[in-house]
């Protein structure tokens, strides 16, 4: 794929006019050597390690931002899942660990820290349960901490006991942050097939197979892709796909260049580049707008899933051509509150929860930043999670749910989080109960396609 001088000028235009940026440079840090039965000593260990490893992250990314003229929006840290690192701690809960992570993130100057996490796709240990039960208070009492729980994999099936528990945890988290529209739930995600090297929040954690310290980069360019599609004159879908592919190539090249330079300057291994198109609430930086530029009157109309499949596939093909270090989630995000076009589609009645669920079959990562009525039962939240986990498990892909049961809100109201988290209209859920199904518990077995050996 040859790049001509005109395309170099186009790249400059992308940064200046079309919201092209590096969404996140995320430093992954292993905390496995910090374990200690005394939780106070454990907290001292993780604070010292996080702050020492990440002390130059913000300064270095600022220097590179100035050098290349490419905006870097967030600097983040991910750590070993705390349920694993703190397993030996003799403590009733892990809230103090979350507070220590928050203090370390503030000292390092980063925007978020992820890894208050547990992996329970086949069952829970004592440490897992301590962490999960600590999530509501942990997220209510911190600013920068993000939490994730993996409850399903294609190889293990779906842990329905954990799914049932997470519905209650989400409700409790919303209640404890009710003064802020339930913002704690915006920092909590439930996964199937969670990746070990995801740079995006709220699901980032430093996986067990990862090195001591690593730099992972997430790019963002919906506005760039939308502009490229809009410039075409009456194209067919093949031409649209080719245009998106070429645009994704340029976006990916830029992201890898920045990531490798950050790694070189910090003396840290470069991990992966996540290709995900991550929208923002800014006008013109929307995944929904790309789908509408393909010919849909509104995102959510019939044909939306097909258009999203085309977009996701073309982004992956262009990105894979540009880098041999593609990882993380690498697809197109469809978070309602973070995408101006999605918000308008919901308000217009074009986009429902059920249609969003269908769209998650062909993209990453799942039902993201969805606001539902505050009186939604915990079992209904668990059932929404179970449906999304089934899509991930059967299709051998990452799926997730980040849902906000907005305290005191009804359908038609909206929640306001500000910043990259944006705002979301409250969407209706089914009035029919899933309680008996969720309370059965147990495990939905792994599908036949898990038998690959």
Curated annotation (Swiss-Prot):
Top-level taxonomic group: Archaea
InterPro entries: UPF0210
Gene3D superfamilies from the UniProt entry: 3.20.70.20
Transmembrane segments annotated in the record for this chain: none
Protein family according to the UniProt entry: Belongs to the UPF0210 family.
Name this polypeptide is given: UPF0210 protein MM_0081
Species of provenance: Methanosarcina mazei (strain ATCC BAA-159 / DSM 3647 / Goe1 / Go1 / JCM 11833 / OCM 88)
